[in-house]
């Protein structure tokens, strides 16, 4: 009996050892290169794929599969697992992209307050005016050098949208709520006002709320119809009502109405205002970076103009960006409205009026009878 048990034990041990070996398929880069794979990323991808998804196969079986993929990689591009290897093997002929030259002379543009504008901004506007799609432009007195189009620069284009001319923080804006509160109350209740400012928004890059705030912008169809936006919806939900960093702020102050015929129909007098400045948070930044890269790949420009790469509005990428940009703009507005609504509720007041205006955007307008995109 003892002898039989020993034999049984040995057999079980051998069987377990065999299973253990089979469960830990190990392939080396040398083996993979030996069957014809060239040195490069494909070797490590093949090694990882086989050892992860084919761990119950023998080395010979795994190598045979790799040989078959190597022989006809195009047959495996739709395979859920082996496509990772096949994609590294298939040589895709890249569409030839030729650099687009700038026009020798630029379109005319207005300069307001030229003596106040730095040289870098003037040079950038000269470059932008030479774009083949440029129609007209303008420089504001406070214009200064930016990326591509100067900050404070305006550019109208023909059926083309320039993601970087719109900007990274799409739809960034200022929003003002006016309350029927005597300005003296700001000093008397300073601690209270300060507490509610900090409690009802979040400052700092990447900040997110843990609780959900409902808003119709989060249910927009663009989040499901544009593949790139799908994974951004959750972050947009978490960042709704946050303020970000940099020059973004939320602050109370004094508002003085002096015009009897003001458009808000408010009596002349002094009020407390809540002013905010922020944009579309991570949603807008991701949209800007993604479509800027696409534009730079499709529209290759000279080095000094590369950030002015555009997307034609009659292309899929151009139409997608237009929809995504408008979504980001509406999201930025929703962020401000959320901040103002939370703070108004916290201080027990309802605003008499609200004013907001945005930048970092593009609009469809008419210029001398021509349809243009104004950045």
Question: Model regions: which residues?
Answer:
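Acidic, glycine-rich loop-and-strand cores that form catalytic or ligand-binding grooves
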Residues: 209-220
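Short, glycine/acidic-enriched loop or turn micro-motifs at the edges of active sites
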Residues: 144, 172, 280
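An N-terminal structural lobe/cap that precedes and organizes the functional/catalytic core
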Residues: 105-108, 124-168, 176
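Metal-associated gating/positioning segment near the N- to mid-region
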Residues: 175-187, 192
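Polybasic, low-complexity association/targeting segments
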Residues: 74-114, 341, 346-350
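Short, low-complexity, charge-dense intrinsically disordered segments
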Residues: 2-16
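Domain-length cofactor-binding catalytic modules of enzymes
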Residues: 107, 117-120, 132-135, 148-151, ...
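Charged substrate- and nucleic-acid-binding regions of tRNA-handling and nucleotidyl-transfer enzymes
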Residues: 22-89
């Amino acid at each position: 009996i003892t002898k039989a048990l020993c034999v049984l034990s040995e057999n079980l041990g051998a069987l377990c050892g065999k299973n253990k070996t089979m469960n830990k398929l190990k392939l080396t880069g040398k083996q993979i290169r030996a069957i014809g794979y060239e040195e490069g990323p494909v070797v490590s991808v093949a090694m990882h794929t086989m050892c992860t998804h084919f761990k119950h196969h023998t080395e010979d079986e795994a190598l045979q599969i790799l040989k078959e993929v190597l022989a006809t990689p195009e047959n495996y591009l739709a395979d859920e697992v082996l496509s990772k290897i096949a994609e590294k093997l298939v040589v895709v002929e890249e569409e030839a992209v030729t650099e687009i030259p700038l026009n020798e002379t630029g379109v005319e543009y207005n300069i307001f307050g030229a003596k106040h504008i730095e040289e870098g901004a003037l040079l950038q506007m000269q470059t932008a005016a030479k774009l083949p799609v440029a129609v007209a432009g303008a420089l504001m007195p406070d214009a200064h050098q930016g990326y591509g189009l100067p900050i404070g620069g305006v550019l109208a284009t023909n059926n083309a949208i320039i993601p970087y001319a719109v900007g990274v923080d799409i739809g960034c804006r200022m929003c003002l709520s006016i309350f029927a509160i005597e300005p003296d109350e700001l000093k008397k209740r300073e601690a209270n006002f300060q507490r509610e400012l900090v409690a009802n928004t979040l400052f700092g890059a990447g900040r997110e709320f843990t609780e959900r705030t409902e808003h119709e912008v989060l249910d927009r169809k663009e989040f499901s119809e544009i593949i790139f936006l799908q994974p951004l919806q959750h972050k947009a939900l978490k960042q709704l009502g946050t303020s970000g960093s940099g020059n973004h702020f939320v602050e109370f102050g004094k508002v003085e109405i002096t015009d009897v015929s003001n458009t808000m129909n408010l009596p002349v007098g002094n009020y407390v205002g809540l002013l905010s400045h922020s944009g579309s948070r991570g949603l807008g930044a991701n949209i800007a970076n993604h479509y800027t890269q696409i534009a730079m790949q499709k529209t290759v420009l000279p080095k000094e103009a590369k950030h002015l790469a555009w997307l034609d509005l009659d292309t899929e990428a151009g139409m997608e960006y237009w929809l995504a940009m408008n979504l980001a703009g509406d999201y930025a507005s929703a962020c401000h409205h959320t901040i103002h609504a939370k703070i108004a509720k916290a201080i027990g007041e309802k605003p008499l009026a609200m004013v907001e205006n945005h930048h970092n955007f593009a609009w469809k307008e008419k210029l001398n009878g021509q349809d243009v995109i104004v950045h």
